[in-house]
């Protein structure tokens, strides 16, 4: 996922497949091609799909989580290549379809229809609804495992007074 985000943002990036020490000259190597990095990403995700457990666990990465991620990665890369005139988009879109079809056909996930307000239940439940949610985080205030959703709804000053430029310059 780390490299996928880097490719989305920067395109060509250097690929490292082993830990490096701070004095390693490879830290300054040139960027690897997008094609090379994306092939390595798919190689890694295919390895994960083969090795991860199949059991459904909403709070842990499983084979189903990796398949969903592969579908998403391939959809992004395939459409990016198609609409930017880069060759090879068909292969990525085909891989996206294969991963999505396998997920739909073989995974234990279903659309949640457990109440009269299923959409609300997905987002207001204290625990993730394991029949539909693929991966979630279990927040527990007692263990100080919390989210930062308030950062998206509050101002940058978090309710404290903010200083304007005139006050700062005075």
Residue ranges and their predicted role:
Residues 1-64, 72-91:
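Aromatic-anchored glycine-rich loop motif in surface-exposed flexible loops
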Residues 13, 47, 60, 64-67, ...:
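An aromatic- and glycine-enriched ligand-binding surface/loop that stacks and positions planar moieties
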